[in-house]
Amino acid sequence: MDKLLAWSVKQQQEGTNEPPPDPKLLAQLFGAPDDAQLMVQAMVVITQPDNKLEDKEVAFDNFEMLVENLDNANMMKNLKLWEPLLAQLSSPHPSLQKLAAWVVATATQNNPKSQEALVEQGDAGIKKLVDLTSHDDPEVVVKSLFALASAIRNCDDAYKLFESADGLKKVVGHLKPDATAQVKSKTLGVLTGILESETDLMKPEEKRQVFDILVKELETDDHIPSLERSLHVLVLLNQKGFPFTPEETEQVKKAAKRVEGKLDEEDVKYNEDLKYVNNL
């Protein structure tokens, strides 16, 4: 209160242009709830059985926006919010399952503390997300893939849980001709996250499986972003110690030519993956 009074006095003095007081301090001063309280309140709305589905969805949207802040995401552990959040992955309502997966993705993205907090939840987290990649609702599948990509990147403990849930086999299964562009994109995002991790996580036989599938995809897929991402994964495989035979090198170069033919001249000029393949 003293700081607020001092600021008010200075503002009234001629020629003074003091910066306004911290909005968070003002909020606390006048009794507005802080982010921790808002997160808890949102989760109460989400978990109350009698609340309308629409109200729960709005609360989830608010919760997701709050955990975009790294500090807020890391508060989830102390606030004991991980357990009720992950319970929503088993909700009978696909919209709540989707939103829960989205929050996991947001909270763990480039956030080692939240990744470890998720790992501590065991099968309720990673394994359940792997299971949801087989959901009938494509939006649940997309958000679950997004969550897995965020959760396992550069987190060996999360990858171990992913591996024990047979995650790679289930995720790679989405790389098929009839999969939507969005599902393919998120699937390739998971593979990219694994291969760009500092630790070489994939086993040789798993790399072989991914290579064989992607080479076929590059022959038939016409979605430019998917083509570019598929080629990037092939490059990452090679960089992570998966050697191409002369025949496979020709396959990759053929795929790269197909990608090149879909891009404009400027994109080709700055595409590092095309440069890499040309130098094989």
UniProtKB/Swiss-Prot annotation:
Which cellular compartments is it found in? Cytoplasm
> Can you cite an annotated GO cellular component?
endoplasmic reticulum
Q: Where are the ARM repeats?
A: 10-51, 70-109, 112-153, 156-196, 199-239
Looking up Pfam families in the UniProt record yields: Fes1
Q: Provide one Gene Ontology biological process annotation.
A: regulation of translation
Give the keywords, sorted.
Cytoplasm, Repeat, Translation regulation
Q: Which domain of life is it from?
A: Eukaryota
> Can you name one GO molecular function term for this protein?
adenyl-nucleotide exchange factor activity
Broad class of the protein's primary localization: cytoplasm
Family of this protein: Belongs to the FES1 family.
Task: Please give the function described in this protein's UniProt entry.
Answer: Functions as a nucleotide exchange factor (NEF) for Hsp70 chaperones which accelerates the release of ADP. Required for fully efficient Hsp70-mediated folding of proteins.
Q: What is this protein called?
A: Hsp70 nucleotide exchange factor FES1
Give the species this sequence originates from.
Yarrowia lipolytica (strain CLIB 122 / E 150)
Higher taxonomy: Eukaryota, Fungi, Dikarya, Ascomycota, Saccharomycotina
